[in-house]
Amino acid sequence: MEGEIFLRALLINASPKKDGNTARLLGLVAEAFLQRGIGTEILWLGEQQYAFCRGCRSCYQTAECVQRDDVQEILKRMSEADVIAIASPDYWGGITGQLKAFIDRCTPYSPAHQPHAALPAGKRGISLALSAREDPRECKEILARIDRFFVRLGIKPMANYYTCGVLTEDDLNQNEGKLAEAAFFGTEIAKALVK
């Protein structure tokens, strides 16, 4: 049936800024996905309300977190998605605090203890990173960190993308080469998903 959505993607913006470079990058990926008929939602961690992990280890016995906040809704949306993309800017050489706090709250899903919760099988993950610095090493560390998170959740990493030298919004928005490269990445991933 024409117009029917067979794949769903959840794109997670881990930047403290709602409308900065990370949002622009995810927007380009979302456009490419939508053009290929992939149902796409962008979720900004900055507007979600969740506390830090308490380290209480209750989830080691119950596979559930004792804290009730927006983490459960985020995980529900991840559970419903076929593809999950997480984008983080470089903050002091790594992922943002918002993303780290969310990852820590996913401890009920850690295979390091039994019982543990699990997302449905077959999900694919895309990691994206941005940095103000020109040195790509920090972006590569961000990508590796996100991919490790995916693997522990049973999500198969399928692609990653990074761009360096983007401190201000103009550094990305006024750089046709970087915009075209990011749009091309989104298009190629969308093609691979709907083969």
Residue ranges of each PLM-predicted region?
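Sparse recognition of residues in long alpha-helices and their boundaries
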Residues: I38, P115-A118, V166
